[in-house]
Amino acid sequence: MVSNHARNEIEDHLGHVPSWIDSLAEPASDHSWGLVRDLEFGETELTAREKALIGVGVAAAIKCPYCTDFHKAEARMEDVTDEELAEAVNLASNTQYFSTVLHGSEVDIEEFTAETAEIVEYIENQRAAPAGAD
């Protein structure tokens, strides 16, 4: 159970203390709230909009209805469109698909990493080249 101090913070941030807060186990309950407070609601390198889109994609990938509901509501508060939500979910799906293929095929990680570096270098060079310079 979270401390009284954390309960007061939660109420200040969310308007009330949601029932799921009592599911947080000791001794990490206050810390768990701190993660939500600092990562979800705090000022970080990512905007609230970016966090919401990432959250929707991850929630879909891990098939969590709780997370999906929360992050979609969060995204709506940031004026994320249906099209952007669909794209975030499709990107997460794409990552999950290729992860399954790569793991199931036991692709060599060192070879994959080297090939990825080559691909990135090629794309960066293409982007840096003046238009029409082939």
Please state what every model-predicted region is.
Residues 1-134:
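Hydrophobic alpha-helical segments
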